[in-house]
């Protein structure tokens, strides 16, 4: 590399002093070092050299070197607030979950593939949704019992549940943050002209749908979704906002128990391969009690909770009184006048009590007579 030639012995010594290598040294394998680590070790050591030890030309190099380092540190400080602003923005979408489902998007409609349990679950969850909606509906249409109803399918995936609801007559909007899932769903519904008119798919999150669909839906379906979201309470609040007063929320999910960890993750994912590895995170599982404690304060009254059990040998689901594994929940949004803010209710209570006390006093009664 560098020899005595043009640089001269003085220039070579200067380069060696600044840490750019020694021509006579044996070449060492490169070391991967981050920029911050390098700045804290090599550059700091070099900057400890006294300017008068370098001579006139060395002092100029030293000053230029220090100025460049100062500029780099300023750039870093300007970037920090933007990074912090981005990282603190809240969303119900977990980016790690998105990556998992991106890799599985092409297998949605394989009835014997990775999503076989979801195909089989339709035998229970579709009637569960239909029957509970009919309890609140005044009109019934033979053959199309959900005709006239508008349903939001959150986390619709490839449309496994969206299409059966559309066949029952409902107008269904399926949303999913994974673009690959929506492409698969769009392609599959195109084979049925009737479904093509009744079903609409969008690549978006639930909180994005709130902006344009407040109080628009008769029902919101979140089947096998809440165990994949971040900020569960924010997710429930968004469900409330897009529902019409008196609308229904349907949730199927996994309970947070030792049994659900043993069977839902260890057996189903790691041993039997019924579910792809990494599909579930036990810390995100939610118990019926925990779910109800979030639903009720947010204006959603729980009507039904029922256990679901999957038989991996037959490939079928059945209802159960045991909710320690999977369960389905149906909640109804309260009417506008029924769901008052706590502060408003307390204020009305205090006003009523004050009125009762004042009207009961002798002086007030005397004034009322006159």
Swiss-Prot record:
| Transit sequence range | 1-86
Q: What is its EC number?
A: 2.1.1.64, 2.1.1.-, 2.1.1.114
Q: Which Pfam families match?
A: Methyltransf_23 (PF13489)
Q: What's the cofactor?
A: Mg(2+)
Tell me the membrane topology, using the record's own terms. Answer: Peripheral membrane protein
Q: Name one GO biological process term.
A: glycerol metabolic process
Per the record, residues carrying N6-acetyllysine are 144, 150, 197
- Top EC class, one word: transferase
Q: What keywords sit in the KW lines?
A: Acetylation, Magnesium, Membrane, Metal-binding, Methyltransferase, Mitochondrion, Mitochondrion inner membrane, S-adenosyl-L-methionine, Transferase, Transit peptide, Ubiquinone biosynthesis
What molecular function terms (GO) are annotated for this protein? 3-demethylubiquinol 3-O-methyltransferase activity; 3-demethylubiquinone 3-O-methyltransferase activity; polyprenyldihydroxybenzoate methyltransferase activity
Which residues of this UniProt protein bind S-adenosyl-L-methionine? 125, 155, 176, 223
InterPro entries on file? SAM-dependent_MTases_sf (IPR029063), UbiG_MeTrfase (IPR010233)
What is this enzyme's catalytic activity, as reactions? 3,4-dihydroxy-5-(all-trans-decaprenyl)benzoate + S-adenosyl-L-methionine = 4-hydroxy-3-methoxy-5-(all-trans-decaprenyl)benzoate + S-adenosyl-L-homocysteine + H(+); a 3-demethylubiquinone + S-adenosyl-L-methionine = a ubiquinone + S-adenosyl-L-homocysteine; 3-demethylubiquinol-10 + S-adenosyl-L-methionine = ubiquinol-10 + S-adenosyl-L-homocysteine + H(+)
Indicate yes or no for the key word Signal: no
Q: Which residues bind Mg(2+)?
A: 224, 227-228
Q: Name one GO cellular component term.
A: ubiquinone biosynthesis complex
Keyword presence, Magnesium: yes
Instruction: Provide the residue span(s) of the region labelled Disordered.
Output: 336-370
| Role played | O-methyltransferase required for two non-consecutive steps during ubiquinone biosynthesis. Catalyzes the 2 O-methylation of 3,4-dihydroxy-5-(all-trans-decaprenyl)benzoic acid into 4-hydroxy-3-methoxy-5-(all-trans-decaprenyl)benzoic acid. Also catalyzes the last step of ubiquinone biosynthesis by mediating methylation of 3-demethylubiquinone into ubiquinone. Also able to mediate the methylation of 3-demethylubiquinol-10 into ubiquinol-10.
What does the sequence similarity comment in the record state about its family? Belongs to the class I-like SAM-binding methyltransferase superfamily. UbiG/COQ3 family.
On assembly, the entry states: Component of a multi-subunit COQ enzyme complex, composed of at least COQ3, COQ4, COQ5, COQ6, COQ7 and COQ9.
Q: What is this protein identified as?
A: Ubiquinone biosynthesis O-methyltransferase, mitochondrial
- Origin organism of this chain? Mus musculus (Mouse)
Q: Which gene encodes it?
A: Coq3
